[in-house]
Amino acid sequence: AKAGRDRNMRNSSRRAVTGFSLFAQWLQCIVGCENKSKSGEHPMTRITFRALTTVATCLVFSAAAAQDIRHQLAADVSAGRIESDIRTLVGFGTRHTLSETESDSRGIGAARRWIADEFRRISADCGGCLEVLTISDTVTGRRIPEPTEVVSVVAIQRGTLDPERMVMMSGDIDSRVSDALNGTSDSPGANDNASGMAGAIEAARVLSQHEFPGTIVYAGLSGEEQGLYGGRIVAEHAKRAGWRIKAVLNNDMIGNITGINGVTDNTTARVFSEGTRYVETEEEARTRRFSGGEVDSPSRNLARYVDRMADEFIPNLDVMMIYRLDRFGRGGHHRPFNEAGIPGVRIMETNEHYHRQHQDLRVEDGIEYGDVIEGVNFDYARKLTALNVVSLAGMAMAPPFPANVEIEGAVRPSTTLRWTVPEGRAADNLAGYRVYWRLTTEPQWTWSRDVGLVDSFTLENIVIDNYLFGVASVSKDGVASPVVFPGPTGSFGD
C-alpha cells in the first residue's frame, strides 16, 4: 500500500510539474511580446498568436495522452490466457535443456515446438503478421557435457516505417531441478520460467492485433539454466544478420508474490540493469571518467523508461530500479545481449522464494520444495506482462531513438546538446525532440523541455557541472523514446 501511495504521489508531482511547465511556457510567450517586433507589428498580435499556439499545442498533446492506445493494451492482457500457457508448459514434465527432444508430450523438444506452433496460431489471427523462426547451435560446456543442440524460438512483428529497428521481449523455455545435469526428473518450472515465457506469448497475442512503426520481437530462449546459451546464440545471430536491436526486456520469474523473507507483495517489480556498458573501450572509459555517465548506460535508461511506463500505464505497480546487472552473483538472459553491445534489462518479481527455485520436488522437514503451479500468482504475472506490453509498444511507436548525441558546456553558463536528425521513411512520425536533465544524485529524469524538430539546443544558465543530460525523440502522437545520454556511454547505436 505504501508503495502504491508513493507511486501516486510521484505521479501527482510529475503532473504538477508538467502543468507548471506548460503554464511557464505560456507566460514566457506573453512576456516575450512586451517589445514591439522589428517588423513593426503590434505586440498584441504576437501575444494572441503565440498564446493560442501554445494552448493549441497543449490541447493536442493532452488529447493524445488521453487517447493513448497503451492504456487499452495493458487492459487487453489476460491472466486466464497466461495461466493456460503456464499450465501447458508445466505439462511437458521437464523442459531441461538435456531432456527428451523427440517426444510430442514430454521434454524441451515438445515444449519448443508447442511455442512455435502458438506463435504461428497468433500469426494466423493477425493475417500472417509474425515471422516465426528457430535459431540454434550445438554447444558443450560445464553443464552440457555432450554436444547438444540449443534451440530458441523467435517471432518477429515487422514495423511499418522502420522495420530494421527492433525491440525484444524474451522468456526462457528451459527448466531444472536441484542437479543442473538432471534432464530426466520432473521439473515443472512454473515460475522459473514458464511465467516469463507465457508472458512473451501473451504479449505477442495482444500487440500483434496492432501495427507499429518499429519492429517487435518475441523470443523463447533455451539453455538459460545451463549457462545462458540461448541468449548468446540469438545475440550472435542478431549481430550477423544486422538486426538493430535497441532494447531487450528479459522476463525471468514474473509470477511469485510471496518471498523467502515472508513478504507478500503484488504491487512492486524489480528491473535490473548494467550501469556502464560491458563493451565499453578503454578510451571510452577514460572519457566517461571526466564527463560522467556511470549510471547512464542505454540499459540503465531503458530501466528508467520501464519505470516511467509503470507509473503512467500500470495501476498499483511500482518499479524498483536495481543498480546492478542482476541479483548478487547471479545471471539472466539479458546478460549475453549486453555482452554483444545490445541494451537489455531483467524484469522480475520483487520477492523470490528459493524453496521454489532449482529444487527437486519433495517435502523435507515439513517444507514443500519445487517450482510448482501453486506458487504462481497469475494476476501478478498479468500485471508484469502488461508492463512489458506498454514498454514494447511505446518504444515501437516512438520515432528513431536520438543518435550521435553530443554535449558541450565546460566553463560556460549554459549547456548545449547536439544530435543527428534522421531522414527518410523511418522518420515519418518524428515530430521533434525533448531535452532532459536531472541532478547527478537523482535516479529518474526530473526536468524536460520540448525543443522542436532541431538538431541542437542550448539550455541557458543550466551549468553542465551540476546536472546530467539526455535527449529523447517524440512522435507526432506525443510518444517519446527512451532518453539517450550523450556520447558512447549512453548510445543505443545508430
Q: What are these language model-derived features?
A:
Residues 413-428:
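Conserved aromatic anchor
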Residues 476-494:
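Extracellular fibronectin type III
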Residues 90, 254-274, 321-397:
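Active-site-adjacent mobile loop/cap segments within catalytic or ligand-binding domains
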Residues 73, 81-158:
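A non-catalytic alpha/beta surface segment that caps or lines the substrate-entry region
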Residues 459-479:
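Beta-strand-rich modules
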Residues 221-335, 340, 344:
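Metal-dependent peptidase/peptidase-like ectodomains
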Residues 155, 169, 174-175, 180-228, ...:
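Alpha-helical metal-binding/catalytic segments enriched in His/Glu/Asp
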Residues 1-3:
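Residue-level detector of structural "landmarks"
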